[in-house]
Design a protein with these regions (language model features):
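Substrate-binding clefts and catalytic carboxylate motifs of secreted carbohydrate-active enzymes
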Residues: 151-173
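Glycoside hydrolase catalytic-domain groove-lining segments
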Residues: 66-69, 94-156
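Surface-exposed cleft-lining segments at the edges of enzyme active sites
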Residues: 3-6, 36-47, 112-124, 155-159
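Active-site-adjacent "subsite" loops/lids of carbohydrate-active enzymes
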Residues: 1-20
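Active-site groove signature of glycoside hydrolases
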Residues: 16-47, 71-73
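Alpha-helical scaffolding within the catalytic cores
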Residues: 14-21, 76-101, 124-133, 169-171
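Aromatic-lined carbohydrate-recognition surfaces of secreted/lumenal glycan-active proteins
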Residues: 31-34, 53-93, 140-152
Length: 173
C-alpha cells in the first residue's frame, strides 16, 4: 500500500469522496486541502501528484457544480518562511508564491490559515502590512479559514487575551 497521491487507489478515493460531497451537499464553498503548502514542504516528491489531482478534480467539480467555489488553504506563516526549522529553508518574509500559483487558474478564491503566535512572541509584533501582500498579489476573493493567537503560555508559544484582540485587529486591517 503506497499512500501517496500517485497511487491510483488514493486518487480514485479522493475523487469519489469529493464528488459525493458535491452531489449530496451542494456546497457553495469546497476546500480540497488544508494548509497544503505544509504538505508540499514536507513531501516535495509527492507535491506534483497532489497538484495534478487537484486540477483533475477541480474540472470534475465544475462540470457538475459550476457555481461551487473550489480552493485549497495555505498556511500563511509557513508561506512567509517564518517557522523555525522550516524544511524549505527559505528567507523570512520571502513569500513562496510559487506554492500558491501552481494551483492557478483553478483557485476560485485564495484562502489562508494564520497562527502568528508561531512566529511572534506577541500579537503587537505583527507588522501592520503582514497580510497586505495577499491584497496586492491577486484580485480574487480572500478568506481566512482558520487562525488565532494563543491566550496563554504553551511550550515555546507566548500569548494572552490581549494578544487575541490584537490578532483580530491585525487580520481585519
Amino acid at each position: 500500500w503506497d499512500s501517496n497521491f500517485a497511487n491510483p487507489d488514493v486518487r480514485a478515493a479522493f475523487t469519489n469522496h469529493t464528488l459525493r460531497i458535491v452531489r449530496e451537499f451542494h456546497p457553495r464553498y469546497l476546500g480540497l486541502a488544508s494548509e497544503i503548502n505544509t504538505y508540499m514542504d514536507t513531501y516535495p516528491k509527492d507535491a506534483q501528484n497532489f497538484i495534478s489531482l487537484y486540477h483533475e478534480v477541480y474540472a470534475k467539480i465544475k462540470a457538475e457544480a459550476p457555481d461551487t467555489q473550489v480552493f485549497v488553504t495555505f498556511q500563511w506563516e509557513d508561506l512567509n518562511n517564518l517557522f523555525i526549522g522550516d524544511p524549505s529553508g527559505g528567507t523570512p518574509y520571502q513569500i513562496k508564491w510559487e506554492l500558491v500559483e501552481v494551483f492557478e487558474p483553478n483557485l476560485d478564491l485564495w484562502v489562508i490559515s494564520s497562527y502568528p503566535f508561531a512566529a511572534f512572541d506577541s500579537a503587537s509584533e505583527i507588522p501592520a502590512d503582514y497580510y497586505t501582500p495577499l491584497l496586492t498579489r491577486t484580485d480574487k476573493l480572500l478568506a481566512v479559514a482558520e487562525g488565532g493567537f494563543t491566550s496563554r503560555e504553551d511550550g515555546p508559544f507566548h500569548g494572552n487575551e490581549q494578544d487575541q484582540v490584537d490578532y483580530l485587529n491585525a487580520i481585519h486591517t
